[in-house]
Amino acid sequence: TSFNSFVWDLNKYINVFVYTFKEKTTAGISHLPYTPRENSLPGLTANNHYFSNMPSYTHCISINNTYITEDDVYTTLAHELGHYLGLFHVFSEQECNETDYCEDTPNYDRNAYTEWLGTLTQPYNFLEVVKRNGCEGESFISTNVMDYFHSYQNRFTANQYSRVRHVLENSPLIPGPKNIITTKVAREDIVPAARAIE
């Protein structure tokens, strides 16, 4: 189902849709942003097409209303907003060979962590399960919003902040102050074409 008829102006709003997913164990999903070719960001697609064209798909964040609970709706929304604004997971799912392009976020093997969780007896000791063994041999407490359970999920790092700021200032289809005039997308059904670029 396309939600394009429900989408508000992507230059002014981040569209969040809440509905029942076919995939029952997914809490949320999000589109990643584009960056201009002239000012790209590692890991994100450089595409100038959306500076002057609206996408044919629904560029948004989606939250699963059957899987999400009252306890984690806030962290799920914050996590999906992180993706929408250019952030990746702070872990690897293929041993330790993935990156989030942020030097100040320790990486760890999520599959190894999940296997370790399977050896524990429930209920878990939260102070034990928030610990991670990093890919460089270090131990740390998981606090990053871009991690999965079990984590405090209440922090971003300086490098993550820089990535988000870059996206806000340079990317099409993202609200926020822009560094260049071409990052505003014309939407004639909302703003007349002559005034669409601010």
Segments predicted by a language model, with ranges:
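The catalytic-center signature of Zn2+-dependent metalloproteases
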Residues: 59-155
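Extended aliphatic helical segments
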Residues: 7, 16-18, 73, 90, ...
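Propeptide-to-catalytic entry region of secreted or membrane-anchored zinc metalloproteases
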Residues: 1-14, 19-20, 169, 181-198
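Detector for Asparagine
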Residues: 4, 11, 15, 39, ...
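C-terminal/domain-terminus segments
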Residues: 32-39, 79, 144, 150-193
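An almost-null, non-specific background feature
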Residues: 17, 23-28, 70-72, 94-96, ...
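Active-site-proximal segment of zinc-dependent metalloprotease catalytic domains
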Residues: 2-92
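Weak global preference for isoleucine
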Residues: 14, 29, 61-63, 68, ...
